[in-house]
């Protein structure tokens, strides 16, 4: 088994605060801090990670520093978010969640993920980023751990 891990918490998952993708962001930064994030994954990328930080009004480096220094459990991380988020209203959370759930990858990204997974790019194929990222994670997990 690998000494690094593919993050398997979906971007579609929310913790008690109700913010989708936040548990995945915590997992990826935590794994990177421990030197255990699979090399093909950024701890904080320009997609859902950046969207989530921006929606909450959190600074990337402050989040990284907190996780590095404190190695928090997920509820401890959410407590930090609750304390420091600049926009944590129900409306802001719902707007963010809708943006994440409604995001579609570009054609090239979709085709690449579907091809790697051996799936046809037809009318039944997922188009949304969350579903495609799940497929990509499961494929990467299979390659790294099960193959």
Model regions and ranges:
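Amphipathic alpha-helical packing elements
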Residues: 37-81
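Alpha-helical structural motif
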Residues: 18-21, 59, 73, 92
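An exposed acidic His-Trp-rich patch
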Residues: 74-106
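Polar/charged low-complexity regulatory segments
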Residues: 2-40, 49, 96-147
């Amino acid at each position: 088994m690998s000494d690094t891990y593919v993050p398997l918490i979906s971007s579609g998952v929310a913790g008690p605060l109700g913010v989708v993708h936040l548990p995945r962001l915590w997992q990826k930064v935590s794994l990177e801090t421990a030197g255990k994030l699979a090399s093909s994954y950024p701890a904080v990328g320009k997609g859902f990670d950046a969207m989530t930080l921006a929606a909450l009004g959190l600074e990337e480096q402050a989040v990284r520093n907190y996780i590095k220094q404190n190695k928090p459990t997920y509820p401890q991380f959410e407590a930090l978010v609750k304390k420091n988020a600049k926009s944590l209203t129900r409306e802001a959370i719902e707007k963010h969640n809708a943006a994440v759930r409604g995001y579609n990858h570009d054609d090239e990204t979709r085709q690449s993920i579907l091809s790697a997974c051996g799936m046809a790019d037809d009318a039944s194929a997922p188009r949304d980023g969350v579903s495609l990222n799940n497929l990509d994670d499961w494929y990467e997990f299979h390659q790294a751990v099960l193959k």
